[in-house]
Amino acid sequence: MSTEHKKQSLSAVTLAAIGVVYGDIGTSPLYTLRECFSGHYGFDVRPDVVFGFLSLIFWMLILIVSVKYLTYVMRADNAGEGGILTLMSLAGRNTSSRATSILVILGLIGGSFFYGEVVITPAISVMSAIEGLEIAAPALDPYIVPCSIAVLTLLFVIQKHGTGSVGKLFAPVMLVWFLTLALLGLRSIIANPEVLAALNPKWAISFFTEYKSVSFFALGAVVLAITGVEALYADMGHFGKFPIRLAWFTVVLPSLVLNYFGQGALLLKNPEAIKNPFFLLAPDWALIPLLILATLATVIASQAVISGVFSLTRQAVRLGYLPPMRIIHTSEMESGQIYIPVINWTLYLAVVLVIVGFERSSNLAAAYGIAVTGTMVITSVLFCTVALKNWHWNRFFVYFLLVALLVIDVPMFSANALKLFSGGWLPLSLGLVMFIIMTTWKSERFSLLRRMHEHGNSLEAMIASLEKSPPVRVPGTAVYMSRAMNVIPFALLHNLKHNKVLHDRVVLLTLRTEDAPYVHNVNRVTIEQLSPTFWRVVASYGWRETPNVEEIFHRCGLEGLPCQMMETSFFMSHESLILTKRPWYLFLRGKLFIALSRNALRAADQFEIPPNRVIELGTQVEI
């Protein structure tokens, strides 16, 4: 590729990263500084307080986003992919089984926190933009909630159609948004350049020394400036490290700093502007265009969050932490563009209830932060584990780095934990529900498979017996889904027991999820002939991939085992779960597992096998 083409490609990817990765953090100027002076903390709009908050915001953007995430955390990738579950997987590779269990729990807590915060993010972003109506026309105040719901309803409805065509507009719109942030801020800074003194960290330090405990509580508002910081790491696989870093340092960070300091300059000049300093930065003639642009930007930010939920859910499903569910690919070109109906509509219902219940973005701000800062603490611990165990960094440097990260993260988390009764219970409750679901599905599924393995018949002995004294053979190929490599599938046993026949060719198909986002086609399928009529096929997929039976058959044909979909019968085992006597808490967990199993996507639907080729055989299993 020529140098010119490389530059064009880098520019395109960097622009795309601006449109997707930075949507959430890019819309935080709508509400962050306003919330710092909300009645929760009791600060008057005085120069020293304005300087203190601006200094805190600036250095938080530098230390947490620029240093922690962009410089350190993004080094931890699995074949280019990032995210809290990826970090969890990396951290557990070279540790003891006990330590791995602890790290897995931490990773699942972090993932659960994400589900909790994701309900708040679209609501607070869109409501903050729509609240600009108050400035343009105060009489429209009663319509803020209905308008916010209408905008988000449209966003969730179009998810099933994919965002491929509309998504092309995301990057240009967000670029215009960031340039607008910069211009509005610069215009105000030029009028009051003394606000730039807040770049000096002494203002942040003096803010803490003067206001002591109250300033500590105010960290709960300052954290709003870094909403969506996890997206930088989670979306690394889509865009790559360098474009994400380039977009931050050349466009996003300068625009955010200029806008925050522009709002601060406005407050120094006119303290009354605290009612909505972002929209009051704009001249009167630009208010309506800014309102429209802000709404578009918050919709794009919400879209990025929704896409993030879909990606995290698919990863959790493929890693066995959530039950199988319908995943629809909305693009033939981009494997990352997916739609999960049950997640989409559950999230929509939760967001609408949050908007109706909290009514104002200021009320929602009181609920935000506790989960995201908890995830930040977990990320620091997991990253330092990877640095120590996987990369073998100097032990003393890793300990120093961990302490340095926690010195920032723990106070942030502690300050936000104080929001528990003012709204912080919401993301924690939602996160707790997801944590219970994920741990229940993983542990109960493991116990179920272990029980089936213990009571199963040996594969080798069974095949030898069948070849020695074969039952009646019928023409064609039979495929049996096999979870365990050395145990006869239940469906095969029941077919022999009730039908007393066997196909001329029997394929035992095992699907394996590797600890990687993708598996190369060369390593996709391995075939082993177990006897003249039995074959074992193991198909390997990464956790970002969706298994496809037609593709497996194609690879089998290339490896010398031709299979035709419409000439093959697929035998599936369907377990009817019976709950045995347990302690009450395990009994409840068992009930939840049974409910999840009943609503899980059947294997035939999961792998898109034609219904007329599927035969399901039921079996009762005690758990």
UniProtKB/Swiss-Prot annotation:
InterPro entries: K+_transporter, K_trans_C, K_trans_N, Kup. Its main location: membrane. The chain crosses the membrane at residues 10-30, 47-67, 102-122, 138-158, 166-186, 214-234, 248-268, 277-297, 338-358, 364-384, 396-416, 420-440. It is a multi-pass membrane protein. Pfam families: K_trans (PF02705), K_trans_C (PF22776). It is found in: Cell inner membrane. It catalyses: K(+)(in) + H(+)(in) = K(+)(out) + H(+)(out). Keywords: Cell inner membrane, Cell membrane, Ion transport, Membrane, Potassium, Potassium transport, Symport, Transmembrane, Transmembrane helix, Transport. GO terms for cellular component: plasma membrane. The keyword DNA damage does not apply. One of its GO terms (molecular function) is symporter activity. The keyword Transmembrane helix applies. Belongs to the HAK/KUP transporter (TC 2.A.72) family. HAMAP family: Kup. Responsible for the low-affinity transport of potassium into the cell. Likely operates as a K(+):H(+) symporter. This is Low affinity potassium transport system protein Kup. It comes from Yersinia enterocolitica serotype O:8 / biotype 1B (strain NCTC 13174 / 8081).
